[in-house]
Amino acid sequence: TWDNYRGQVDTGGPLNDSGTIRGRAVVTEQTRQYFYDVASRKDQIYYGALDFDLSPDTTLGLGMAYEDVDATPCWGGLPRYADGSDLHLKRSTCLNTSWNNQRSKRATYFADLKHQFNDDWSLKVAGVYSRNTQDMEYAFPSGAVPVGATASNTLMLGSIYDYDQRDYGFDAYVDGKFDAFGQQHELTVGANASRSHKDDFYAVAALPQRQNVLDPNHHIPQPDESYYLANASRGGPVDMHIKQYGAYSIARLKLADPLTLVLGSRVSWYKSDTDSVQYFRGEGTQVDTKSTETGQVTPFAGVLFDLNDNLTAYASYTDIFTPQGAYKTIDGSTLKPLVGQSYELGIKGEWFDGRLNSSFNLFRTIQKDAAQDDPRCEDSSCSINSGK
């Protein structure tokens, strides 16, 4: 297990005699080493939740989660000879430095309110806030090794990253059942919104000392922040604001006892604003970008046919629309949204009151402009839109 140790305490239950107040608390800690050099990781996770029955029909839930990670990661992979052949390095080889460090903390607070109007209709309202901070510094090799070399003089790239992101989310929906044309149908109608603010700084620079990947030195001198600013091939501060709003509905219409038609749609609004400075060899260039999508409609349709009490055949279609404003190009601008279509055909089964489930599915997904790493950025810090 490579010195992998994990402990967890998980407790919960009613907190009063009537059971109208319930709670759960979880504490987890894990420390581990790895089979490759240098790397290690320590995780601490805390979770707590309370449920309050305000009335027989209304329940309020409150909770929080916290995660703290302190790691020395091994990033960047292993190079090859210039002709693409294997270097035959030891399985334990890591070419990073001992001062590689990742420190991240995430705190999440959430609340939800559920109300049952009657046997058929209910309301749920939920909100969440989270803050994620990360401080990282790492070095990794870049470039191939000359064929037949017994030593190498491989370029080492260093990177620093200071990250602070705050996210707010809200969702509310009503769902229920209604009778029409001699059948019972289901309907869900809702709306949601989210807001995100990311404030970060990063820089990537070639380190003064190179690496012999055939005999790694894990103690290459660690530069200070001023070195990165003066020698950065790219980097700088980034201040990003993203807002999303949407309304959605889905109806499950019973056309006959074995046949159900599912129709749904979402209307989305999206806006992102990014202010950044791109550094190159100590010189900074201001880059400001904006992205807006208004009233984007994403439909969904499906049909289900009950073959018997256990098996259901189905087919579905949906449009794909995913904003990608969080991805930035090498010049600091944002990517176009990912768009496309998805088709699915299959059979699903359920036995023993849901204790055993099975499915067989065929998918066809067509995507355009999905984000992918830009090969001009060795540390995968920038992206480009892919083709179709």
Question: How would you name each of these model-derived features?
Answer:
Residues Y109-N132, M156-V277:
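Face-selective signature of the C-terminal outer-membrane beta-barrel domain
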Residues T11-D17, T31, L54-P56, A111, ...:
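Outer-membrane beta-barrel proteins
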Residues Q30-Y34, Y47-Q116, R131-Q165, Q209-G235, ...:
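Acidic/polar loop-and-plug regions of large Gram-negative outer-membrane beta-barrel proteins
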Residues D3-G7, K42-Q44, R103-A107, D164-Y168, ...:
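Residues that define the transmembrane beta-barrel architecture of outer-membrane proteins
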Residues D112-Y138, D306-D309, A313-Y314, P337-K388:
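Membrane-embedded beta-barrel scaffold of Gram-negative outer-membrane proteins
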Residues D51-S55, Q165, Q184-S196, V238-Q367:
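Structural signature of Gram-negative outer-membrane beta-barrels, strongest in the C-terminal barrel
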Residues T1-N4, E29-Q33, K42-Q44, Y66-D70, ...:
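Transmembrane beta-strands of outer-membrane beta-barrel pores
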Residues T1-G48, L54-T58, A107, F352, ...:
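Outer-membrane beta-barrel translocator/receptor signature
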